[in-house]
Amino acid sequence: MNKIYRLKFSKRLNALVAVSELARGCDHSTEKGSEKPARMKVRHLALKPLSAILLSLGVTSIPQSVLASGLQGMDVVHGTATMQVDGNKTIIRNSVDAIINWKQFNIDQNEMVQFLQENNNSAVFNRVTSNQISQLKGILDSNGQVFLINPNGITIGKDAIINTNGFTASTLDISNENIKARNFTLEQTKDKALAEIVNHGLITVGKDGSVNLIGGKVKNEGVISVNGGSISLLAGQKITISDIINPTITYSVAAPENEAINLGDIFAKGGNINVRAATIRNQGKLSADSVSKDKSGNIVLSAKEGEAEISGVISAQNQQAKGGKLMITGDKVTLKTGAVIDLSGKEGGETYLGGDERGEGKNGIQLAKKTTLEKGSTINVSGKEKGGRAIVWGDIALIDGNINAQGSGDIAKTGGFVETSGHYLSIDSNAIVKTKEWLLDPNDVTIEAETHSRQAKSIDEELPNGDGALNNPKKNGESVTTLTNKTISEFLKNAKSVNITAKRKITVNSSINIGANSNLTLWSEGQSNGGVEINDDITSTGGNLTIYSGG
């Protein structure tokens, strides 16, 4: 959902500022023929620094008792901070890592608050100590990093503009001692209700800066944009960020109600996007596209306790180099109908859905109980020169969507690698896989003639209670068919390789044809008296067949 912003002339600033498309405009002329304000689609918006505007106004210092109505009860508890006010424009000059407690930290729609700091790496920590939520509806500007901590909740309005060198908003609290030590451990305040952060506005930061929205629940409906930096949506009860500039995140405690939702647009040009929560829902756009030969984007979505449900678009393209990297994990991972993952590039990127290669769980990666690619979903790791890698794992893995890991020209030379694996695996006849090499690695494999398509079922229905439940998952009430002979024969038409491995048994109940220069491997470890059972013809028109049965 792209937000459309336009330029609006501000009489009090005597300048153009970016505002929501819903805001009322102000013409430069009152004549009927005056041109309408220009419109632009926000991608990586670089706002004009507001410091030059404010300093030119010649503001003077006044007592904080007459401070603009949104900010109240300023108390500097560490470092120094001074304030200048002119009507609805407030400038605060602070020392490095200053800590300021507030009774209220709001910015009204007609207000502007600016923190002038010693350098770009300087930070100011603002904490609300009352029971009021923070509502940011106006402009927040700084040459440094701004932290806003409010355990009651934070809402960023649809007309709000945040333009800093780094921005962190959190409903999880942090002690003054941890701030001073630069130990960014944030925790849910004891006995406090679950608090939410919601962004409806525009958040931009300087090059290589970071935006972090941290809370019991986190929701983005607006636009967040960084260039080469990082954007994190983190929902939990205890979270540690070891480096706020290049976040390394330790996700300590989560509960089912800790949810992260993106309905808006998030752009981290050539940077990193982290979404971590108990459950995750994306219906907007997550983009870490790059045009750099030296750097590609990286996206991580981790639903620690529940489902990662993906609609919309996730993109980390790079047409100058290798596409980016994407990892989506959770108890359950679902790529919904119409969802698009695009990691294409000069060389295709890498994506991991539900786990890693063969479900080994290396480096502590979470393995999904169920991973679904719904019909009409797309994974694209294709490359102009070489295809990339797509790994899909689930204890139950249902593949009804499309996976493209093609290179250019001869796919036998430039194609990539696709793995669709799980203890129980079903490849629907609707699925289209384009790659050089395709690995399937379930417990058992059955190749049948095409019947009807799969219908989505819950985990309980896939693994019903009763005798042999885990060994007898269902497909529309029938035994699982791993894939159809049509799917495998179509794939093997032109110089491609399919490696089907099974821990127990491989059963071929319908005919297969292997095309010229293609390779089919049927490999059974032979556990539980398994092996390879062939009940129909396997023919070849210049291809190769390898059969191995262990046990």
Residue ranges of model-derived segments:
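Active-site and channel-lining beta-strand-loop segments
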Residues: 6-9
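IQ-motif-like calmodulin-binding regions
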Residues: 12
